[in-house]
């Protein structure tokens, strides 16, 4: 029954918009809705001092600094993200993107999304490490690190060149598999929620990293923002095993060991 209801809803959606509109404008609006609704809470928590005991860093951004981030994000999203969605549609269509019924079986959806997460994490890790080389950091990646004390919305605050560079890691999986638009939307939503959580600046008892062994999360990524760029490590986007395999989490692990020994948070 749930499947038939979803099919009916999808049929109504595809009957109201063209596939081009769904893959571009509607995708953009879905991204903006999920991104800002999931990212605003940590901004408000920081601004009004809520859940202070769960805040990873004691420092906070000023309201004007937060507002600056939001305004630039809107500019970047409209001037970079939306045009990229429009221009990449023919390529996705060529690679097999479809929006028609039937919707893919749940096993196909799950397997594809898991593949996207693993592939994105691998590509992002190496791309992110490259961005921490001296020249690229100075001219590109330093924009993202303007917020040494991150909050959810800073997850997508970056130089336009970085948006395109690391954005490749997000779209290469779907481009390879030619997914159904429904799967693409689910992947986008989950990826947005993941990166917003990783940049939230808060580590709660219910944070995903407390339950998912290989998941990095907010504490893992917050360390990356608060130390010198040449020593930050923790380059992967979602999981921890890439940093563990290549030894780029050693400083973080040492810091956590000292923190646990002293019984206090860094």
Curated annotation (Swiss-Prot):
Task: Name the Gene Ontology molecular function terms of this record.
Answer: aldehyde oxygenase (deformylating) activity; C-4 methylsterol oxidase activity; iron ion binding
**In terms of one coarse class, where is the protein primarily found?**
endoplasmic reticulum
Q: Which keywords does UniProt give here? A: Endoplasmic reticulum, Lyase, Membrane, NADP, Transmembrane, Transmembrane helix
Where's it found, cell-wise? Endoplasmic reticulum membrane
Q: Which family does it belong to?
A: Belongs to the sterol desaturase family.
Fill in the subunit field for this protein: Homodimer.
This protein's name = Very-long-chain aldehyde decarbonylase GL1-11
